Amino acid sequence: MKIIFMGSPEFSVPALCALLEEKDHEVIAVYTRLPKPAGRRGKVLTKTPIHIIAEQNNIEVNTPKSLKHDYEQEKIFALNPDVIVVVAYGLIIPEAVLSIPKYGCINIHPSLLPRWRGAAPIHYAILSGDEQTGVTIMQMNELWDEGDILLQRDIPIDEQDNIDTLSQKLSNLGSSMLIEVLNNIDHLVPIKQNANDATYTNKIIDFHIDCNEEAQVICRKIRALYPKAFLFFNDKRLRILKANYCPDSDLQNLKPGTVINSHMHIKCKNGVLIPLIVQLEGKNPCSINDFIHGYSISNSSIT
């Protein structure tokens, strides 16, 4: 089967690697996002992980800004793919492109659709305290994450999973499911999603920890937004990379954000946040014990 692969971030890598190991399938071209400026003054252009792997395997790489233009669609048509595989590509796939391959476009989506449609399904599964999540391989249509389900599998969410560890588990699961779908694509019966069960995600832009939230919710936020969740310690950003929590039945009168002891336990709504690994802006990550030995905790401001 001739395949065009569309993907960009690290999450896409296991799927592409799985395809490259298959003798019955050939990746004839890769589509990925444009290299981004990086380094001091943005003088270095950084290619996506998919771009790098494609070049290492002598696969044609395309980095269009959009697939809406006729000449981009004509290029895909000329490649004559049997199927297009889309994994966290980052561009909208127009209906004109969806209809080019014999088997259409199939997508690896890291949730149990129709739960958590949208851009941040793994984050939302952790934030919401879901006990399980999974991967859906779907037949793409012109609607956002509403295509028919070709295959779906679930996995448990471990209490210590953060966005990195859970993403890796789902990425690996999705890559094996992809091969199963491609090898059996003529025999699969697509299943329509139940729109009544749909839930949606939005791009996450707020990484600040609000101590007025419940401590358990804050711990989930730290895991879901790793390594970006932060609070302000004496007006400097302090990232909380790992934390635990406990009930606070004896501390109801304290204001949220209060540092309640020398271990830097922080009063929150209905609980106490127990930081374990932190990173002050401009510094390296460290254990909370190392942090409190280097900074004065008493009379500190936590917001």
UniProtKB/Swiss-Prot annotation:
By its UniProt entry, which Pfam families does this protein fall under? Formyl_trans_C (PF02911), Formyl_trans_N (PF00551)
The yes or no answer to whether the keyword Protein biosynthesis is present is yes
Q: Which organism is it from?
A: Ehrlichia chaffeensis (strain ATCC CRL-10679 / Arkansas)
Choose one Gene Ontology CC annotation of this protein and give it: cytosol
What class does this enzyme belong to in the EC scheme?
transferase
Report which superkingdom the organism of origin falls in.
Bacteria
Alphabetized SUPFAM superfamilies for the sequence? FMT C-terminal domain-like, Formyltransferase
The name under which this protein is listed is Methionyl-tRNA formyltransferase
Which GO molecular function entries does the Swiss-Prot or TrEMBL record give?
methionyl-tRNA formyltransferase activity
Reaction it catalyzes: L-methionyl-tRNA(fMet) + (6R)-10-formyltetrahydrofolate = N-formyl-L-methionyl-tRNA(fMet) + (6S)-5,6,7,8-tetrahydrofolate + H(+)
* Residue sites binding (6S)-5,6,7,8-tetrahydrofolate per the record: S111, L112, L113, P114
The yes or no answer to whether the keyword S-adenosyl-L-methionine is present is no
EC number annotated for this UniProt entry: 2.1.2.9
Which InterPro entries does UniProt cross-reference here? Answer: Fmt (IPR005794), Formyl_trans_C (IPR005793), Formyl_trans_C_sf (IPR037022), Formyl_transf_N (IPR002376), Formyl_transf_N_sf (IPR036477), Formyl_transferase-like_C_sf (IPR011034), Met-tRNA-FMT_C (IPR044135), Met-tRNA-FMT_N (IPR041711)
